[in-house]
């Protein structure tokens, strides 16, 4: 350990390295980095004195130091935190000098103050980093926790800053604001030796962001040196909620051992994953495969899935449990009432209905005051929308604003969001009269293959690995998780085996017909018969994917999935 640390201090000092927090706030990261490096340096100098006496040390201990405060830089947009960061760095330096004096009997004299950390009070995205941070003879280390703003929360001004950071040709759709710091760091370190790491929201390693973000990073010769998978971080700032974060560090050194840390749950302790060789963009030990959005399924045997229908109605086309009896008592509205199922209804077994008026008699509103009131409410809601396309639909208040899958045969429903705690994705069968909302995806499934695939451990592993998240919950998408699922071509034997295994799952559920899917798949309360049925399904699915037997771990499945994806997309 001492040799390793000695090497670190030597590189830091003799090569004249700079260390920079590109979003330093009040300086916490800089303070910790400087304090820890000074602590290590003091331990090494004290150890050197114990082993050799004072003969190898200078009379002025500052001549033996390699960690200097003036090689630390920070950028903070607000004046007050920037001043706090400056002061805090001086105090940390003072404390480190006291520790050095206690260990060696002397410390550098800092008064009057001649050197200190450089803290720029500036917007990091408009500051010229190469000018603000002079190129050293040694290495440059960049780190920080840039602002957490998603695709849907950034302003037009922030979008312009992102475009400037990435360049005019970069497609920014879905990219988080935080990725602007990745772009500027790539530019800064293009002609410098160094490494970098950021704390970011976990969304950058989910869904369609990894392909857009990591492609230019990997193309520039960078690889992931270390990473912490998703964990919850409670901000200490007033009014700030907990966010789900990842930490990713990058290096261009191919010989550096990759280190990956995981958390059993978002607020748990970090545990290092043993035997890691390569960390890919999804923070998995595996090849650097990037899963792109697709408009059609990669797998030849999978049909397309379609999300359901969205009313944009201020609740006027939806019938709640409390309203149901009154609506059904209206002879005009009753024929148009159909079950309306969103993700909550699908998973928890709750009931809700809608007025499906696609074939409505044009005279119907004149014969039902309640129907007329509801349709007028829909028209008024749409007329005041900011979206011109929605305002246009005020002319058709009896129709859902977005019409998704509506089937005249039974079909399968998959919730858009499901708890990460469940071992399996809760998939449902629906009769043709059911209208699914835009929070459910549907697909025709005449032979049970869709149900079998979506209900397997292989698929939920894929979803956990490359899919998006809502906080820590799993988010299903047609373009990434479904269309990108690397299911090889099925033989007739495969299809028959999957259909039989899917039927066993349904039979196990039928043993407890009153249970909701949430109850069937309660993480700590699954029925043994249902677990056994899913084990049987997994044995079939895992073998189809290339495993010699049912996989025992998520890692085994991830390795198969990425290998199959690389094979099918090569």
Predicted regions span which residues?
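Extended charged low-complexity segments that act as oligomerization/scaffolding linkers
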Residues: 62-68, 115-118, 240
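Class I S-adenosyl-L-methionine
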Residues: 1-67, 77, 81, 123, ...
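Non-catalytic DNA-recognition/assembly elements of restriction-modification systems
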Residues: 24, 370-378, 394, 487-570
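Polybasic, glycine- and aromatic-enriched phosphate-binding surface used to engage nucleic acids
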Residues: 179, 256, 264-500, 504, ...
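Signature of N6-adenine DNA methyltransferases within the class I
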Residues: 31, 38, 82, 90, ...
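Conserved SAM-binding motif I beta-strand of class I
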Residues: 72-75
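Conserved SAM-binding loop
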Residues: 85
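Flexible, glycine/threonine-enriched loop-and-boundary segments that flank and lead into catalytic domains
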Residues: 1-18, 59, 107, 111-141, ...
């Amino acid at each position: 350990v001492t040799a390793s640390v000695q090497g670190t201090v030597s590189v830091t000092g003799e090569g004249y390295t700079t260390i920079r927090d590109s979003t330093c706030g009040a300086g916490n990261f800089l303070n910790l980095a400087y304090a820890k490096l000074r602590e290590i340096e003091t331990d090494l100098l004290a150890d050197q004195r114990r082993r050799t006496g004072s003969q190898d040390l200078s009379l002025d201990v500052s001549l033996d130091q390699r960690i200097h405060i003036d090689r630390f830089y920070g950028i903070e947009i607000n004046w007050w935190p920037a001043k706090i960061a400056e002061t805090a760095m001086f105090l940390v330096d003072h404390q480190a000098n006291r520790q050095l004096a206690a260990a060696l009997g002397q410390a550098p004299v800092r008064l009057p103050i001649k050197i200190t950390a450089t803290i720029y009070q500036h917007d990091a995205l408009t500051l010229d980093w190469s000018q603000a941070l002079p190129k050293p003879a040694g290495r440059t280390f960049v780190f920080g926790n840039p602002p957490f703003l998603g695709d849907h929360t950034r302003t037009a001004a922030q979008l312009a800053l992102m475009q400037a950071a990435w360049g005019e040709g970069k497609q920014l759709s879905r990219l988080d604001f935080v990725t602007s710091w990745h772009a500027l760091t790539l530019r800064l370190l293009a002609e410098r030796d160094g490494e970098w790491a950021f704390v970011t929201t976990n969304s950058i390693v989910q869904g369609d962001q990894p392909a857009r973000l990591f492609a230019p990073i990997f193309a520039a010769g960078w690889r992931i040196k270390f990473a912490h998978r998703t964990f919850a971080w409670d901000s200490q700032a007033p009014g700030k909620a907990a966010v789900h974060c990842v930490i990713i560090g990058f290096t261009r050194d191919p010989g550096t051992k990759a280190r990956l840390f995981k958390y059993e749950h978002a607020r748990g302790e970090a545990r290092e994953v043993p035997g890691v060789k390569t960390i890919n963009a999804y923070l998995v030990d595996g090849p650097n495969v990037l899963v792109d959005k697709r408009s059609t399924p990669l797998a030849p045997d999978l049909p397309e899935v379609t999300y359901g229908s969205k009313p944009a109605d201020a609740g006027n086309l939806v019938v709640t449990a409390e309203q149901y009896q009154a609506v059904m008592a209206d002879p005009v509205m009753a024929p148009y009432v159909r079950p309306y199922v969103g993700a909550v209804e699908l998973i928890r077994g709750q009931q809700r209905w809608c007025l499906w008026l696609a074939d409505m008699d044009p005279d119907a509103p004149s014969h039902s005051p309640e129907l007329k009131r509801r349709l007028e409410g829909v028209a008024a809601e749409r007329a005041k929308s900011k979206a011109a396309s929605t305002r246009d639909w005020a002319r058709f208040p009896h129709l859902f604003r977005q019409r998704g899958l509506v089937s005249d045969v039974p079909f399968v429903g998959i919730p858009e969001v499901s708890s990460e705690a469940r071992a399996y994705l809760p998939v449902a069968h629906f009769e043709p009269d059911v209208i699914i909302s835009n929070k459910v995806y549907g697909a025709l499934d005449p032979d049970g293959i869709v149900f079998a695939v979506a209900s397997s451990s292989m698929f939920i592993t894929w979803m956990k690995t490359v899919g998006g998240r809502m906080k820590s919950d799993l988010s299903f998408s047609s373009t990434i998780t479904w269309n990108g699922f690397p299911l090889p071509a099925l033989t007739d034997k495969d299809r028959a085996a999957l259909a039989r295994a899917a039927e066993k799952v349904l039979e196990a559920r039928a043993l407890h017909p009153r249970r909701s899917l949430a109850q069937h798949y309660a993480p700590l309360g699954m029925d043994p018969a249902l677990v056994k049925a899913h084990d049987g399904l997994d044995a079939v699915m895992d073998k189809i994917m290339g495993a010699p037997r049912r996989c025992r771990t998520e890692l085994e499945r991830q390795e198969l999935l990425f290998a199959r994806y690389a094979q099918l997309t090569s």
